[in-house]
C-alpha cells in the first residue's frame, strides 16, 4: 500500500516536535542527505564577482595636506591641464581613472598615495 502526500503530512502533523526531529535524523541516515536549510547565494555570488573583477575605477577620496603634489600626480596620470586637474582634486571624491586594469589601478593608487592623497579602488 502506497501512502499519499496528504496521508504522510497528516501522520507527521500528529507527531511531537521531538518525534519529528528523530524522523528527520532517520531520513538523513537512510537517504544520505542533510536537511539543512537552503542558504541564499547572494553573498557568495557577490564575492565571486569581486574576485573576477577585471576593470577598476581609481577614486580620489581626499587630497590630503600635499595638494600641489596630488595635482601633479593627477596631471601625470590623466594628461589633464593644470586647471582641470586642480578642479578634480578640489572636487574630491572624484574618479581619476575609469575602467582600467588591476595593475594600472594599483599603480595609479600608489602614485596618488605617495603624493599624499587618499584613494579607493572600485
UniProtKB/Swiss-Prot annotation:
InterPro entries: Ribosomal_bL12, Ribosomal_bL12_C, Ribosomal_bL12_C/ClpS-like, Ribosomal_bL12_oligo, Ribosomal_bL12_oligo_N_sf. CDD domains: Ribosomal_L7_L12. GO terms for biological process: translation. One of its GO terms (molecular function) is structural constituent of ribosome. NCBIfam families: L12 (TIGR00855). HAMAP family: Ribosomal_bL12. Forms part of the ribosomal stalk which helps the ribosome interact with GTP-bound translation factors. Is thus essential for accurate translation. Homodimer. Part of the ribosomal stalk of the 50S ribosomal subunit. Forms a multimeric L10(L12)X complex, where L10 forms an elongated spine to which 2 to 4 L12 dimers bind in a sequential fashion. Binds GTP-bound translation factors. This is Large ribosomal subunit protein bL12. It comes from Pseudomonas entomophila (strain L48). The lineage of its organism: Bacteria, Pseudomonadati, Pseudomonadota, Gammaproteobacteria, Pseudomonadales. The gene is rplL.
